[in-house]
């Protein structure tokens, strides 16, 4: 697994790209599932108007962003979907990387059951941040959980491919930060 020191880099854009191709692993409730990280978004507080910690705003929900890098920041979006972020950087520097999509690697059958995805297109199983959490069983219970633990970690194993950058999704309110290419996608060659 990646050491805690990996997550302490203060350059969240670098880490959002560097996480691509690594395998996100969960071993929860006796079931192991994992996926290759293929899409991320960087959130760089305090200046990023799309970031929960814009202008050093602190709420009960976003407090994990102010922790040392290497923990999970999981929150509910629209009161329905859990979203999983990797907290990066040093204490009190509110940076995080949203894991937007994975490519199933281990336990795809378990992911299908968790998502009730039988007889549906496999390429849509984990192609969104809420779907990732459902497939890997990442719930609010694991908010602030160490990402260097047997239960949840990111493997040193890394797949390569072509990386593209695009604007982040769903942040129309973020003014000049709306169109920055802080979303990173990995296209793995077969």
Swiss-Prot record:
Its EC number is 3.2.2.-. Pfam families: Pur_DNA_glyco (PF02245). It comes from the Bacteria. The keyword Methyltransferase does not apply. GO terms for molecular function: alkylbase DNA N-glycosylase activity; DNA binding. CDD domains: AAG. GO terms for biological process: base-excision repair. Keywords: DNA damage, DNA repair, Hydrolase. HAMAP family: 3MGH (MF_00527). PANTHER family: DNA-3-METHYLADENINE GLYCOSYLASE. Belongs to the DNA glycosylase MPG family. This is Putative 3-methyladenine DNA glycosylase. It comes from Chlamydia abortus (strain DSM 27085 / S26/3).
């Amino acid at each position: 697994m990646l050491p805690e020191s990996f997550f302490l880099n203060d350059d969240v854009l670098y880490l959002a790209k560097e996480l691509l191709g690594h395998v996100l692993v969960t071993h929860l409730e006796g079931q192991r599932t994992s996926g290759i990280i293929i899409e991320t978004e960087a959130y760089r507080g305090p200046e990023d108007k799309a970031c929960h910690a814009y202008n050093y705003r602190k709420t009960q929900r976003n407090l994990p962003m102010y922790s040392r890098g290497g923990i999970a920041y999981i929150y509910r979006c629209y009161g329905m979907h859990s979203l999983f972020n990797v907290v990066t950087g040093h204490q009190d520097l509110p940076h995080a990387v949203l894991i937007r999509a994975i490519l199933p690697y281990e336990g795809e059958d378990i992911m299908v059951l968790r998502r009730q995805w039988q007889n549906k297109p496999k390429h849509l199983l984990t192609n969104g941040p809420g779907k990732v959490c459902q497939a890997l069983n990442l719930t609010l219970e694991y908010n602030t959980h160490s990402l260097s633990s047997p239960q949840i970690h990111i493997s040193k194993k890394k797949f390569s491919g072509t990386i593209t950058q695009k604007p982040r999704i769903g942040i129309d309110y973020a003014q000049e930060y709306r169109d920055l290419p802080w979303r990173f996608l990995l296209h793995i060659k077969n």
